[in-house]
C-alpha cells in the first residue's frame, strides 16, 4: 500500500506531493533495498527532483541486483550517464 501511495504522490502535479512521495520512497528503500520496483521509482523521483547523486546510487544498486542479460540494464546505464552529466566534479567521485 505504501508503494502505491508513494507512486501516486510522485505523479501528482503538486510539487509538495512529489517531495512527500520522494521521502516515502526513501523510507521504503531503507526498509528493502533489494526491491527493484522501489529502487526504480526512487531513482526516477530523485532524478526529477534534481537529486542526481541519489538517483545514480539507486540505479547502481539496481544494476547489482539485475542479471547480466536483463534488458533493463541498458536503460539504467543510460540513465546513470545522463544523471552524471548533471553532477558537479566533486559529486561524481
Region annotations inferred by a language model:
Residues 13-17, 49, 71:
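Short coil/turn and helix-start
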